[in-house]
Design a protein with these regions (language model features):
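Non-catalytic C-terminal accessory region of glycerolipid acyltransferases
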Residues: 10-12, 141-293, 511
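Carboxylate/His-rich catalytic cores and anion/metal-binding grooves
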Residues: 108-115, 366, 372-400
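Conserved N-terminal entry element of GNAT/NAT acetyltransferase domains
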Residues: 286-329
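Short amphipathic alpha-helix that is part of the acyltransferase structural core
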Residues: 311-368, 372-375, 380-384
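Acyl-donor binding region in acyl/amide transferases
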Residues: 343, 353-356, 390-550, 555-565, ...
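Membrane-anchoring hydrophobic helices of lipid-metabolizing enzymes
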Residues: 1-87, 97-99, 106-108, 126-127
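A short helix-loop-beta-strand connector motif used in the catalytic cores of GNAT acetyltransferases and
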Residues: 361-370, 535-536, 561-566, 578
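Glycine- and acidic-residue-rich phosphate-binding/metal-coordinating active-site segment common to enzymes
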Residues: 124, 131-152, 156-162, 166-195, ...
């Protein structure tokens, strides 16, 4: 059947004025130079396949005959039914549209793809497309209203819509020194809001070649005529395609404007380009010392029972949990058990010292909050706490503060922190981490400790984002905190000795953070999507944010698995009253400074 003369997939004589009068040899020469001939040959082969009884759809056959190959991750994230918008970056302009359709139709047949006026000329796509004109100015905008109405109807009927929100192929950016998507159109965000559709982000690797990028700089209006030419290049590479998890309407509704939603969706797509890494333990397993043997429960219990009554800070009867505050000298056996459980807990998340027990030179002069399960007779968790003025007035001065080894504090900040309690080395043992009462009870213990010492109204310390998180995830969390959670005034008063220089997003992604990621709930969704095991934002980080914590600086602790440490400061005088009541009780009144230095 290949000898049958067929209608071309894209006919040059229809695309140019007076094309029907051009000689055939000139048309063929031009079509070969523009890449249209390869499309037409592929179209003939598609028709041959259909004539031979093939049931494959146009997109699948187009990818087959144009040699478009891709490596796909996350196909299971496309919902099998219900209104859904799949948004993607647009690196190629044509081949990515064909692969886009092929991928989506592996899951569902009710697919429409929004294309520009150039792809409208690809006849095989017409049954699947909704056309918009991204180059036509005001007249095109009016004509595009028809396309907008089609999109709304399609989604309201419960179908799947594929969209490249940039509307045109990615081009070279002098600002970013790389090829990036054009601005994403906000009208797609408006449609998503009106229809209540779920959104699935997708990302294609690669970009068009030097010739196309040069045209984009010097004659952007004509570059679409050369998109087909790029397919010849695209058939020589393996494209990496990654699909993110669906974003439900309630999450999308957190954004307040179409611009914010557009930036959020673009960020979700672009973050999929960062490669996942194979995690390696902070300390090689062969180099780790065996964990020391735990102290018998009866000995620990006897030590707990010997503490003065005023050491008890919190009691949760239903969960069988008590929280005590004690000096290290009061609990020598419990201190050893704390060191053992610290090492076990931190190793489980890719941290840990690699030693048999995790104790250091700071433990003896700090106090320790201990959470004990009275029924299981086990240590459940602990927090190391230090009253800064007491430590500073001791023999080691400010060097007795744990974080002085990682951050350079100005004299001004040291003076402020005399009214603060340094907190750190927090853990809840693995067996109790899924018990919601565990963290709450530990923080109730902190609250009662503050009630006993209302003169300390600052809490500060580092919150860790371990190397078990992907580098891209840690970079995203870092960027979010830097944009939305900094105390700009006090951040000038402290510098990390080992700042996180390698944890950076691409510049165009960084620009999306201020508007596209304004809420910690949006960050939480993205972290869960980027992490292969679906883990969320570190629990302690969320807890500090709930208390109104502000970040001061960031550093890397190479001795603790390359952990990213964020130095956080909480002013209890400014913490939300409902949270203070929950953890500290209704009678807690922190004593403020005469002039608070933490307004920022």
């Amino acid at each position: 059947m290949s000898g049958i003369k067929r209608q071309k997939i894209t006919d040059l004589t229809e695309l140019v004025r007076g094309g029907k009068r051009l000689p055939a040899w000139l048309v063929l020469w031009a079509e070969k130079k523009l890449g249209l001939h390869a499309l037409n040959v592929a179209h003939d082969k598609i028709e041959d396949d259909w004539d031979a009884g093939s049931q494959d759809n146009f997109f699948k056959l187009a990818c087959k005959h144009l040699n478009l190959n891709y490596e796909l991750e996350g196909l299971e994230n496309i919902p099998k039914e219900g209104p859904c918008v799949i948004v993607s970056n647009h690196p190629h302009g044509m081949s990515d549209g064909l692969m886009f359709g092929d991928i989506a139709m592996k899951v569902r047949s009710d697919v429409r793809i929004v294309v520009n006026e150039f792809l409208h000329h690809v006849r095989g796509m017409r049954p699947y497309q909704i056309t918009v004109d991204v180059y036509g100015g005001e007249a095109a905008k009016r004509a595009n209203m028809q396309g907008m109405r089609e999109m709304l109807r399609w989604l309201k009927d419960g179908h799947c819509l594929l969209v490249f929100p940039s509307g045109s192929a990615a081009t070279w950016s002098w600002q970013d020194k790389r090829v990036i998507d054009d601005p994403w159109q906000q009208n797609i965000s408006a449609i998503i809001r009106k229809t209540g559709a779920a959104v699935v982000p997708m990302h294609f690797s690669g970009h068009n070649g030097l010739f196309f990028q040069t045209l984009s700089v010097i004659a952007k209006g004509v570059r679409s005529n050369f998109l087909a030419r790029e397919i010849l290049r695209d058939g020589k590479t393996l494209h990496k395609v990654r699909i993110g998890k669906p974003i439900n309407p309630s999450t999308l509704a957190i954004t307040e404007t179409d611009e914010e939603l557009s930036d959020f969706l673009r960020l979700n797509s672009m973050m999929l380009r960062y490669p996942r890494t194979a995690h390696s333990a902070a300390v090689a397993t062969s180099e780790r010392e065996p964990i020391a043997e735990s102290i018998p429960s009866e000995q620990l219990e006897a030590e707990i029972n010997a503490l003065p009554a005023d050491c008890l800070c919190a009691h949760n009867e239903s969960a069988h949990l008590n929280v005590y505050a004690a000096k290290a000298s009061q609990i020598p056996l419990m201190m050893r058990e704390i060191g053992i459980q610290r090492e076990i807990t931190f190793r489980a998340v890719g941290e840990g010292t690699g030693k048999s027990i995790d104790l250091d030179e700071y433990d003896p002069h700090y106090e320790h909050l201990i959470m004990w399960n009275t029924q299981d007779r086990k240590l459940v968790g602990a927090y190391r706490i230090g009253r800064t003025d007491v430590i500073m007035d001791g023999p080691k001065g400010f060097k007795g503060i744990y974080n002085s080894a990682f951050f350079n504090f100005s004299q001004k900040l040291q003076k402020i922190l005399r009214r603060g309690i340094e907190m750190g080395r927090a853990f809840i043992t693995p067996d109790y981490q899924r018990h919601p009462a565990s963290l709450d009870t530990l923080w109730m213990g902190i609250g009662k400790y503050l009630c006993k010492h209302p003169e300390y109204h600052y809490l500060y310390g580092t919150v860790s984002i371990s190397s078990e998180y992907e580098p891209s995830t840690r970079s995203l969390i870092l960027s979010y905190l830097q944009h939305h959670c900094m105390n700009e005034e006090l951040a000038k008063e402290v510098k990390a000795y080992f700042p996180p220089k390698s944890l950076k997003l691409n510049s165009e992604d960084e620009r999306l953070i201020p508007k596209g990621l304004k809420d910690v709930r949006l960050l939480g969704h993205m972290v869960s999507d980027l992490e292969k095991d679906g883990k969320h934002i570190p629990v302690l980080l969320k807890q500090y944010m709930r208390l109104g914590g502000r970040m001061l600086s960031f550093g890397i602790d190479e001795d603790f698995g390359g952990t990213l440490d964020g130095l956080v400061l909480v002013d209890m005088c400014k913490a939300p009253s409902r949270i203070l009541k929950r953890f500290c009780g209704k009678d807690y009144v922190p004593i403020p400074d005469e002039a608070s230095p933490t307004d920022s």
